[in-house]
Amino acid sequence: ALELADDEIALCADTTVALGRRILGKPSDRDEANSFLSLLSGRRHKVITCVAAKKQNQVKVKEVISVVKMKVLSFQEIETYLDSGDWEGKAGGYGIQGPAASFIPWISGSYTGIVGLPLNETMGLLSSLKYPVFGSKNG
């Protein structure tokens, strides 16, 4: 276990994509990324990011759910995106903050949550643990 000083905070976050009841994590290879993108093409899906912060014996957790609409993707769009390698390490096989932004006509929720760290909610967690989010010791 990680040892923290009394004034230190451990922060962690992870993101996954849900299409109905199916969870699309980080694809293990190009073929799986292709499968994920083909499934998401033309559909709405949820992006779920969970953030946790721990200070001493206090643990605070926040789940942020956003809805994302992906346009219908052509074979060429998928192949070009896969060739870019941008899908690697990304839940659902795409990153909204990169070239795949052009695939997303609409979102409802937290853009930074979709990217992988919902900033507003993270600041709220840190503030609730009396961590100086703006550089002030007074919070």
Region locations from a protein language model:
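Anionic-ligand binding patches
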Residues: 1-139
